Amino acid sequence: MRYLDREKLVENLETRMQGNMDAHIIGNASLWGWQDGEEVYRRHFGPDALEGSVYRLASMTKPITGVAAMKLVEEEKLALTDPVDKFYPEFRKIPIVKVENDRLVEIGKPEKMPTVLHLLTHTSGFGGEVEDVQQRQIDPQSNATIQNAVRYFAEAGIGFEPFTNVMYSGRAAFDVLAGIIERITDMPYDVYLKENIFDPCGMMDTTFAPTKEQWERMIPMHDRVDGKACPGRTVDGCVFENVPVTHFAGGAGLASTLEDYTHFARMLLNGGEFAGNRILKPETVALMATPHVPESLMPRTKRWGLSMKVVTREDYGRLPLGCFGWSGAYGTHFWVDPENKITAIYMKNSRYDGGGDAITSAEFEEDVTKALKG
């Protein structure tokens, strides 16, 4: 285990963040780092970033859905090998489609059904250009609830034979997972998360449907045009794009705070336990942090575990082997470093420089890693 040089950590992060603020690369941001059970860094940047500020998580919702699914796997109510049509017979007619002139054209039927494992590892056939078209064309009724959305995606199709390719699914795969969880538990997905993850982890501000008071704490969306900061586009009353708050989008729909998500990350670092409350078994967290996509399908320095990416090669450079975590379209980012007992969380909401390849996320990783001693 290598400890962080706290003085160096503060220097790295303060210099970087001030530079990004001055260049209008970020408008507001909140950072929190922990090592070996102790806070090592915590700071808010920008005029609106305060204790309790609420951020749109976007795809940093996915690890929460991953934990929810794996809790049911532990309870033997769900298996990674379960095909989707076990829960949704509609999927037995799902087509493989391609995009032609912004239309989806059927080109065949899959030989095998997508499974829970495929949904968690972005190998189900959902995603990419096909899902982009599906998202643009989804009708208001299909977009209104998670169950309606699952039926829509079952009819709209997948882009390839499951587990023959890797294609990031922004919403569809994890919407299907959330729908499956609702059917297994006979509970609304938001209620299941509250009772089984949020309440035990002390995540009191994590929600699909913010209250009026939480909306008042919501960080404004930022953008950057011609080197100048400007307001970013949002849809009134929606946490993620045009998804209504009645649709508990398992891939992108949650809002949360720095404090709440840090609790979630620390739970993962602690092997599934937070404040004496057991969410998952240590071996289940380890399974989530294990690559499940072969290098032949994903010859990269990071590969998909269950709902999160895992550093699998030393030439990744910015983080040690075995670190795992994920990001969001609006610039949120986190990782867990089991070897050095670190959790690090970066919150921002911006249409400039977001997603898994955000420059600010890469800089955050570099600045923390360069502060490790030895």
Enumerate the language-model features and the residues they cover.
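A short acidic/small-residue loop/turn micro-motif
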Residues: 47-49, 350-353
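Generic C-terminus detector
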Residues: 351-374
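Short, well-ordered beta-strand elements
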Residues: 335, 341-350
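Acidic helix-start/capping segments at beta-turn-to-alpha-helix junctions
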Residues: 85-94
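Short, surface-exposed loop or secondary-structure junction motifs
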Residues: 94-321
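Active-site SXXK
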Residues: 11-18, 37, 56-84, 174-182, ...
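Short, conserved catalytic-motif segment at the N-terminal edge
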Residues: 3-58, 77, 93-100, 105, ...
